[in-house]
Amino acid sequence: MIRSSCTMGLAETLRPAKKVPTVWWSSPNPMSLNPNRSTMVILIVGEFIFGLGDSLLIAAGVGNTPWTVLAEGIALTAEVWTIGEATFLVSIAVMFLWIPIKETPGIGTILNIIIIALTIHVMVPILPQTENFLVSILMASSGIQLVGIGSTMYLTANLGPGPRDGWMTGLQRATGVPIGRVRITIEVSVLVIGIVLGGTF
């Protein structure tokens, strides 16, 4: 009986969530302009952790996310921007794509644009570049974990999605296409454009 209860509890824990869970720090109103201090702290720390994780992935040199490939491609093409600055510009551009689908940004959306790009801009130049494959794998693994932790923190704050997530969910709502197909279409398109511009993955 105890084993059965433990097994069911584990299964519930590992079951994919259909929506972002509500926790004690979640804002009851995603459009709030005056959220609780604890909510803001967790939001900001989460977005910093996300940016740090993305920075580790970039520094590891063993593979980037599609959006980072695009930012790197833009930075290499322009030759005047860092990846962090290009990430900021991409986020702003994606925000304009919210207009036709009538998405509304929250405080978390705006801070996402600023904090993640700033963290990448500051951290990538100071993180070690290594030719040791095992160290690179360790850095990449740590980066993936930090991105997951950071995402969980800022999404559960419920103060607005990041520009990319908001565009994805907005397109799904506007078109009725399953979210998985929307995500794959967006990320493959972004990846191809990034590669054409010279980004690496």
Residue ranges and their predicted role:
Residues 2-201:
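Core subunits and conserved enzymes of cellular information-processing
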